[in-house]
Amino acid sequence: MKKYISIISSILVITSCDVVEGPYMSDTTNPPINSTTKKILIEDFTGHLCSNCPDAARELTAIKDIYQDQIIGMAIHVSTSFARPYSASQAPAFQYDFRTQWGDNWDDFYGVSEAGLPRGMVNRMGYPENHKLGKDEWASIVANVLNQEPDFELTISSTTDLITINSEILNSINGDYNLVVCLTEDNIINWQKDGANNVEDYEHNHVLRSVLIDEALSSSSSYISGQEIERLINYDLTALEQSNINYSENTAEAGNGNAGNWNSENMSIVSYIYNNITKEIMQVEEAHLNN
């Protein structure tokens, strides 16, 4: 999976570099967003043809209402059964393809949809046996994890073509860690099955759009408290959008190429650090994409 993502990223992401312990300042309109407390990523594996999936989305919203910015959500549309677009003969219903190559790769690796949707992962904890969680299991795990002391702090800032991620080590630690940078989009109005209803104007939020990088946080496995690692990522939103369209049209099963019409005004950057052995997400942060 990582090899495939790395190949795609090398085409669409112009540059990605890291500088250790450098006091840099990005020229950006957006103020940096940083995480000093433990934050949690809830990955909601879903599909617009999944009639029970809106209940999971509402559960995620309820958890976020309680814990506010400590909870970051990501809706990952997966599987031919639940996320394929309908044929053109059934237009206008369910014509959009929310799937991405990264979401499909994650689903293949973690096997979430094979357990039935809706289902999700909370910081990818419990892998490889107990990570595929029903929505009613999310809240209790969140409550247990939020009080943990974080080992990393993430700061995100962006311009129209550059994303800057600063990772600060809060506690000296050894391990094999990766840094991931994703783009998500809110307020996508489109079809969704919700119980017995086909809702034409359902609001889809924090939908995974793209993954810019998934690569080693550092060349070293030893991290020292106070150390900072800065990653600069140039991106081309138009090229990333076209990649999704091409994936839907040429690769995704039953795809139709209707995967564009991104609205950059509604997009966010989600970045996280995960343990490459256990797959557990150690820290996550989110910031609006400055466009």
What are these regions (language model features)?
Residues 1-4, 9-43, 51, 291:
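Bacterial Sec-dependent N-terminal signal peptides
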Residues 31-81:
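Local sequence-structure signature of Cys/Sec-based thiol-disulfide redox active-site neighborhoods
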Residues 75-291:
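Short, conserved sequence motifs used for protein processing/export or organelle targeting and
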